[in-house]
Curated annotation (Swiss-Prot):
Monomer. Homodimer. PANTHER family: CALCIUM-TRANSPORTING ATPASE. It catalyses: Ca(2+)(in) + ATP + H2O = Ca(2+)(out) + ADP + phosphate + H(+); Mn(2+)(in) + ATP + H2O = Mn(2+)(out) + ADP + phosphate + H(+). ATP-driven pump that supplies the Golgi apparatus with Ca(2+) and Mn(2+) ions, both essential cofactors for processing and trafficking of newly synthesized proteins in the secretory pathway. Within a catalytic cycle, acquires Ca(2+) or Mn(2+) ions on the cytoplasmic side of the membrane and delivers them to the lumenal side. The transfer of ions across the membrane is coupled to ATP hydrolysis and is associated with a transient phosphorylation that shifts the pump conformation from inward-facing to outward-facing state. Mg(2+) binds at residues 643, 647. Keywords: ATP-binding, Calcium, Calcium transport, Golgi apparatus, Ion transport, Magnesium, Membrane, Metal-binding, Nucleotide-binding, Translocase, Transmembrane, Transmembrane helix, Transport. This is Calcium-transporting ATPase type 2C member 1.
């Protein structure tokens, strides 16, 4: 491996080498050698001239998020949809055939579709920009011997940066000063435990992964404790953060299932359209008709058969779904993504910050005399209670518990202000515990005389203190740390107010510790006494990163609906399985796989075992990518949730990337398709429900539009091919076309989401939107409409002379069939009475408006002239209503039969299961 990468100044005379160190190499070298390679002055920093000089070659300390495309290009890109291309071709053919009405209506439809899609994507991008501007990155940097407060984007390799508690690390740093420094690297590595940092060089054999480089502070990570200085070794895309970003940009986002379905439908419609042209031309030629005339008729029919309203309904339905998701605090960046969630059958979720809060919390206390206390409440606040045997403990009411809380509070460097932690998460959990008991003031009651800071080697921390009001008394020593280390300094333990010699109790406590550990708790032992080596063992506290509120319920519902959830984390196997079990993700039959085991397998091997795996632990971004690829290889539609830099590449590779809006990094949000503004995992369940509902609405529209379209096409084709008089004139056909693509059709796209839809299994993305069942329903409706309309035409045409009354009856019959067909198309499974006749107000208004329009066409004299109609009697209208309602009645009967069949199948299935159990 090269020590450094050099870039040349493209100037003839003053060629200078500008070095860039990798974090792995920098961690192996002494600080002095790193400074020499970077040509850096660690104490005084760089001068402004040198900073400008280096920036000319390294660029700004930021990421090149793909250059903004001009708005006109973004608008033009919306025309790439196959259905839009087909409609454009239809418009051109309509112009060539002098059918200007069709050409105008199709062009307007196209413009509406692309404009709605363009505006929605533009608004989502702007929302994302505003979200990413909430926290402007700044840092403290030494330049020309002075400490400056500057923007992180100004940093260059060789700059000296100062870090303190609460700071975000602005670039990759090689540390040369560190005092009790702990950094939370969970956003980068997935590790929930803050990493203790040192300055000594590391052997090459021990720094293979990012988490093991203890002398490097990585860009984007958070200082939890201590202070430090470091020299910048990598900025922007040359940082480890940047490596993830480059991987993310290189990953292509897959097409959504809806896009695939619409592509397939576009191809099918094209195929059928050309088929119609060919068949009609062939039949006409065989009948001896003029070939050019037959071509004109067949092209007109093919253009009429293409449902130009489909892209509008799809776009508007998706846009309304996106707007509903915004109300639920979710930003969807691209329209089709919300529907994609409807066929999502696997969710790969990062644990830290997504399933859990990333806020360590004390949940159990075990005193040295065997008393067990449960602690409620989550996070760094005072909300919660300490309960012993059903009673709430407060203050010094229970001395055994209070002593443990006192030791944890005094032997502590963390501070909680306004529910925000300044310090280590584990120490924050102890302060929050003290707040719940009203004892957090104890931290200020003691004066610290000496301190033994925590280190990863000794695994304990101790302080020597005196009480402010009793400074003449001997010092008291408080200790906390790993049980096996703390117990070495203890000689006694407390039992019911008495101090006893530590004997068999040690083994009992060890067993208790093991039991707590098996539950995935991080265990801390606490002790106090006059001197180290003469301490009294007080007891244990169990700490956990708790699950987010409502996650367990959401997980249960999703699993019941056929969605598999897999937890991916950088934590240990024990902790990962404990959290997964609490959430209902892990059972006795589940498997867990480590990152090392994933490395030993290729994608093909992993794809064979991945369906049975519930937990992936010690996983890196590379492993997450492999997991997602193996799931996609099995044909799964994968959603990936996450909030850290380590999730970004997988978020982009997944079919749906879901980022957390509050805790998520900018890189993570850039990679995601959807952002949960409130970080609420339950919103994913709402999105899946929304996605399934949207797809159902699109199917409802397709059923209505194609059945009406096929009926109209068949009616006109039969009349043309069999030399019958045309039952409808041109203006009447235009009016039917307006209804077919107009308000009644559009209103089907805004049908309220059926609450039962979440219980249905995810649909197979390979299935066409035109399923066998849907095609059957379309054909049945079309046949009823054609037969009914032809019957009315035949009934009125008994004198073999076409009169305005004949066409008016036929025309009105077809329109009424249309309305009843739309009514039955509102749901594919439920009766219109079950979903509610007026539950979709827009549909009611649309149908009412269409009927009023039809009555005006029949009875309003000026329109009678335009449409060549005449007034009908009340009896005529009642006859037509009775006849045309048949399409709705038959559809309702089919639904009833299907529901009955489904109930019988469920009953047989449950009976078989019960029999097998017996």
């Amino acid at each position: 491996m090269k020590v450094a990468r050099f870039q040349k100044i493209p100037n003839g005379e003053n060629e200078t080498m500008i070095p860039v160190l990798t974090s792995k190499k920098a961690s192996e070298l002494p600080v002095s050698e790193v400074a020499s390679i970077l040509q850096a002055d660690l104490q005084n920093g760089l001068n402004k001239c040198e900073v400008s000089h280096r920036r000319a070659f390294h660029g700004w300390n930021e990421f090149d998020i793909s250059e903004d495309e001009p708005l006109w290009k973004k608008y033009i890109s919306q025309f790439k949809n196959p259905l839009i291309m087909l409609l454009l071709a239809s418009a051109v053919i309509s112009v060539l055939m002098h059918q200007f009405d069709d050409a105008v209506s199709i062009t307007v439809a196209i413009l509406i579709v692309v404009t709605v899609a363009f505006v929605q994507e533009y608004r989502s991008e702007k929302s994302l920009e505003e979200l990413s501007k909430l926290v402007p990155p700044e840092c403290h940097c030494v330049r020309e011997g002075k400490l400056e407060h500057t923007l992180a984007r100004d940093l260059v390799p060789g700059d000296t940066v100062c870090l303190s508690v609460g700071d975000r690390v602005p670039a990759d740093l090689r540390l040369f000063e560190a005092v009790d420094l702990s950094i939370d690297e969970s956003s980068l590595t997935g590790e929930t435990t803050p990493c203790s940092k040192v300055t000594a060089p590391q052997p090459a054999a021990t720094n293979g992964d990012l988490a093991s480089r203890s002398n490097i502070a990585f860009m984007g990570t958070l200082v939890r404790c201590g202070k430090a200085k470091g020299v910048v070794i990598g900025t922007g895309e040359n940082s480890e953060f940047g490596e993830v970003f480059k991987m993310m940009q290189a990953e292509e986002a897959p097409k959504t299932p809806l896009q695939k379905s619409m592509d397939l439908l576009g191809k099918q419609l094209s195929f059928y359209s050309f088929g119609i042209i060919g068949i009609i031309m062939l039949v006409g030629w065989l009948l001896g008709k003029d070939i050019l005339e037959m071509f004109t008729i067949s092209v007109s029919l093919a253009v009429a058969a293409i449902p130009e309203g489909l892209p509008i309904v799809v776009t508007v339905t998706l846009a309304l779904g996106v707007m509903r998701m915004v109300k639920k605090r979710a930003i969807v960046k691209k329209l089709p993504i919300v529907e994609t969630l409807g066929c999502c059958n696997v969710i790969c979720s990062d644990k830290t910050g997504t399933l859990t809060k990333n806020e360590m919390t004390v949940t159990h206390i075990f005193t040295s005399d065997g008393l067990h206390a449960e602690v409620t409440g989550v996070g760094y606040n005072q909300f919660g209670e300490v309960i012993v045997d059903g009673d709430v403990v407060h203050g010094f009411y229970n001395p055994a518990v209070s002593r443990i809380v006192e030791a944890g509070c005094v032997c502590n460097d963390a501070v909680i202000r306004n529910n925000t932690l300044m310090g280590k998460p584990t120490e924050g959990a102890l302060i929050a515990l003290a707040m719940k008991m009203g004892l957090d003031g104890l931290q200020q009651d003691y004066i610290r005389k000496a301190e033994y800071p925590f280190s990863s080697e000794q695994k304990w921390m101790a302080v020597k203190c005196v009480h402010r009001t009793q400074q003449d008394r001997p010092e008291i020593c408080f200790m906390k740390g790993a049980y096996e280390q703390v117990i070495k300094y203890c000689t006694t333990y407390q039992s019911k107010g008495q101090t006893l010699t530590l004997t068999q109790q040690q083994r009992d406590v060890q067993q208790e510790k093991a039991r707590m550990g098996s539950a995935g708790l991080r265990v801390l032992a606490l002790a106090s006494g006059p001197e180290l080596g003469q301490l009294t063992f007080l007891g244990l506290v169990g700490i956990i990163d708790p699950p987010r509120t409502g996650v367990k319920e959401a997980v249960t519902t999703l699993i019941a609906s056929g969605v598999s959830i897999k937890m991916i984390t950088g934590d240990s196997q024990e902790t990962a399985i404990a959290i997964a079990s609490r959430l209902g993700l892990y059972s006795k039959t589940s498997q867990s796989v480590s990152g090392e085991e994933i490395d030993a397998m290729d994608v093909q091997q992993l794809s064979q075992i991945v369906p049975k795996v519930a937990v992936f632990y010690r996983a890196s971004p590379r492993h997450k990518m492999k997991i997602i690829k193996s799931l996609q290889k099995n044909g799964s539609v994968v959603a990936m949730t996450g909030d850290g830099v380590n999730d970004a590449v997988a978020l982009k590779a997944a079919d749906i990337g879901v980022a957390m809006g509050q805790t998520g990094t900018d890189v993570c949000k850039e990679a995601a398709d959807m952002i949960l503004v409130d970080d609420d995992f339950q919103t994913i369940m709402s999105a899946i429900e929304e996605g399934k509902g949207i797809y159902n609405n699109i199917k409802n529209f397709v059923r209505f539009q194609l059945s009406t379209s096929i009926a109209a096409l068949t009616l006109i084709s039969l009349a043309t091919l069999m030399n019958f008089p045309n039952p409808l004139n041109a203006m009447q056909i235009l009016w039917i076309n307006i209804i077919m693509d107009g308000p009644p059709a559009q209103s089907l796209g805004v049908e309220p989401v059926d609450k039962d839809v979440i219980r249905k299994p995810p649909r197979n993305w390979k299935d066409s939107i035109l399923t066998k069942n849907l095609i059957l329903k379309i054909l049945v409706s079309s046949i009823i409409i054609v037969c009914g309309t032809l019957f009315v035409f035949w009934r009125e045409l008994r004198d073999n002379v076409i009169t305005p009354r004949d066409t008016t009856m036929t025309f009105t019959c077809f329109v009424f069939f249309d309305m009843f067909n739309a009514l039955s198309s509102r749901s594919q499974t439920k009766s219109v009475f079950e979903i509610g006749l007026c539950s979709n107000k827009m549909f009611c208004y649309a149908v009412l408006g269409s009927i009023m329009g039809q009555l005006l066409v029949i009875y309003f004299p000026p329109l009678q002239k335009v449409f060549q109609t005449e007034s009908l009697s009340i009896l005529d209208l009642l006859f037509l209503l009775g006849l045309t309602s048949s399409v709705c009645i038959v559809a309702e009967i089919i639904k009833k039969v299907e529901r009955s069949r489904e109930k019988i199948q469920k009953h047989v299935s449950s009976t078989s299961s019960s029999f097998l159990e017996v």
